[in-house]
Amino acid sequence: MARIAGVNIPDNKHAVISLTYIFGIGRTTAKKILDTVGIAPTTKISQLDDAQLDAIRAEVGNYMTEGDLRREVSMNIKRLVDLGCYRGIRHRRNLPVRGQNTKNNARTRKGPIRSIKR
């Protein structure tokens, strides 16, 4: 297993799929990285030599991934909560943030139904 950006990448999968195991890299970004490095997306990670893996590591280093990206996302949410804006209040109350209806659905975000005690 190759290790890129602190993540173990599976050897038996295509390079474009293996790179998506890194938080912050999806299919499109993985294809861009492989095009920049000059590796075919259908190449398996086990077929790459160390120089090619180092080139991929260097290119992935140009993107914000894993811990840095997670930290930035959580800081953005914390900033909204501290501001007390509408989106921050929705985050604080664990309700949908992007305008979805909550009268009938939104069970994933709201959690299990709490019964009313009489």
UniProtKB/Swiss-Prot annotation:
<comment type="function">
    <text>Located at the top of the head of the 30S subunit, it contacts several helices of the 16S rRNA. In the 70S ribosome it contacts the 23S rRNA (bridge B1a) and protein L5 of the 50S subunit (bridge B1b), connecting the 2 subunits; these bridges are implicated in subunit movement. Contacts the tRNAs in the A and P-sites.</text>
</comment>
<keyword id="KW-0689">Ribosomal protein</keyword>
<dbReference type="GO" id="GO:0019843">
    <property type="term" value="F:rRNA binding"/>
</dbReference>
<dbReference type="GO" id="GO:0015935">
    <property type="term" value="C:small ribosomal subunit"/>
</dbReference>
<keyword id="KW-0699">rRNA-binding</keyword>
<keyword id="KW-0694">RNA-binding</keyword>
<dbReference type="InterPro" id="IPR027437">
    <property type="entry name" value="Rbsml_uS13_C"/>
</dbReference>
<dbReference type="InterPro" id="IPR019980">
    <property type="entry name" value="Ribosomal_uS13_bac-type"/>
</dbReference>
<dbReference type="InterPro" id="IPR010979">
    <property type="entry name" value="Ribosomal_uS13-like_H2TH"/>
</dbReference>
<dbReference type="InterPro" id="IPR001892">
    <property type="entry name" value="Ribosomal_uS13"/>
</dbReference>
<dbReference type="GO" id="GO:0005829">
    <property type="term" value="C:cytosol"/>
</dbReference>
<keyword id="KW-0820">tRNA-binding</keyword>
<feature type="compositionally biased region" description="Basic residues">
    <location>
        <begin position="106"/>
        <end position="118"/>
    </location>
</feature>
<dbReference type="GO" id="GO:0003735">
    <property type="term" value="F:structural constituent of ribosome"/>
</dbReference>
<dbReference type="GO" id="GO:0006412">
    <property type="term" value="P:translation"/>
</dbReference>
<dbReference type="InterPro" id="IPR018269">
    <property type="entry name" value="Ribosomal_uS13_CS"/>
</dbReference>
<comment type="subunit">
    <text>Part of the 30S ribosomal subunit. Forms a loose heterodimer with protein S19. Forms two bridges to the 50S subunit in the 70S ribosome.</text>
</comment>
<feature type="region of interest" description="Disordered">
    <location>
        <begin position="94"/>
        <end position="118"/>
    </location>
</feature>
<comment type="similarity">
    <text>Belongs to the universal ribosomal protein uS13 family.</text>
</comment>
<protein>
    <recommendedName>
        <fullName>Small ribosomal subunit protein uS13</fullName>
    </recommendedName>
</protein>
<dbReference type="Pfam" id="PF00416">
    <property type="entry name" value="Ribosomal_S13"/>
</dbReference>
<keyword id="KW-0687">Ribonucleoprotein</keyword>
<dbReference type="GO" id="GO:0000049">
    <property type="term" value="F:tRNA binding"/>
</dbReference>
